[in-house]
Structures are given as C-alpha cells and as structure tokens.
A protein has these predicted regions:
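Active-site-adjacent structural segments surrounding the nucleophilic cysteine of cysteine proteases
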Residues: 1-50
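Catalytic nucleophile-His microenvironment captured as a short glycine-rich beta-strand/loop
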Residues: 19, 91-126
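Extracytoplasmic/secreted envelope proteins and their assembly/folding machinery
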Residues: 20-28, 38-42, 58-65, 79, ...
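Mid-length scaffold segments of soluble, non-membrane domains
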Residues: 36, 43-74
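Extracytoplasmic/secreted cell-surface and envelope-processing proteins
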Residues: 52-59, 101-106, 129-132
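Loop/turn elements at helix/coil->beta-strand transitions in domains of secreted/extracellular proteins
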Residues: 68-72, 88-92, 115-118, 145-148
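Alpha-helical scaffold elements lining the catalytic groove of polysaccharide deacetylases
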Residues: 77, 85-88
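Noncatalytic regulatory segments and standalone regulatory/sensor domains
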Residues: 113-156
Length: 156
C-alpha cells in the first residue's frame, strides 16, 4: 500500500485509503499468475467503488474479481467457513474494525492456515515493526474478534 503511496484514490491516496484495492491486487496476482498492482486494481473503475469518508465499497471485490477473471467471490461472516476455505487454498479478504490490525477500518488478506489452525495474514499496511507477514494469528481471538465480513475467492 505504501509502495504506491502518492497515487490518488478516493479523497486521498492509495497509502491512506487503498487497503481494499491493494488487498485485491495481492489476491488477483495470486489467482491469475500475473502481477496486478494496486494501480491496476483501481485504474479500471476509478473512484466508482469508493465512498468518501468511509472507504472502498464491499461490492468492489466481486466487481474487481469479474473484471480480472478471478472467479466467484463468496461473502460471509462465518469464521468456520473462512477456516475451511483457507485450508482448501482459497484466499480471503477480511474487513476489520478497530483492534489489532487498525485504529479505524481496514482490509487485510488471509492467505492461509497452518497445520495448527493459525491464520497467515498479508496486511497492505504491514511494516517491519509489526511484521505480520511472519506471524500466525488465532482466528477467533485475533482475526474474527474485529472482523466485519470476509470475501472468499474461488481458486481457478
């Protein structure tokens, strides 16, 4: 997200407001085998899926998936469905409210689950001090505790 920090998005920039498209770019790159940047993830739609003062509309994820050929997207609030999907190799985006991952609202990628049931996270706003890329998270106490919703992406 910060690599594309000064690129305009919404009322600000990708750095300040682009966690949704940046999360989608990670998943689309994985599913298509082609590098899709956060710039690519917003260039096709501009700000049409952005609500000022709120952020990226949830409907963006299915629309972007359709646009980039990433397959079906299932929206859920069920953490067990998410764990099952992760164990089957399906990447997931989670909308987070204030808590471990953010002080406001934020989208993160759940990229997998360990043999011990811990969730692996790609955070578009990760840093060397947080180092979330190298951590394992408990689904119920750390991820689901502040989750608003999840989007499970079909693996093509």
């Amino acid at each position: 997200q910060t690599d594309y920090g000064n690129i305009p998005y919404g009322g600000g920039s990708i750095a300040s407001s682009g966690c949704g498209p940046t999360s989608f770019a990670m998943i689309a790159s994985y599913l298509t085998g082609t590098t899709i940047t956060p710039i690519d993830a917003i260039s096709w739609c501009g700000n049409s899926y952005y609500k000022p003062g709120v952020g990226t509309y949830w409907s963006y994820f299915q629309a972007a998936s359709d646009h980039f050929g990433c397959g079906a997207v299932t929206q859920t609030r069920d953490p067990n469905q998410v764990l099952q999907a992760l164990s089957e190799g399906h990447p997931v985006i989670s909308s987070q409210r204030a808590g471990l991952f953010t002080s406001g609202g934020h989208f993160i990628v759940l990229r997998g689950v360990t043999a011990g049931g811990k969730v692996l996270v790609n955070d578009p706003n990760d840093s060397s001090s947080k180092n979330y890329i190298n951590r394992e998270f408990d689904m119920m106490t750390e991820v689901h505790a502040t989750a608003n919703a999840y989007w499970i992406f079909a693996k093509k």
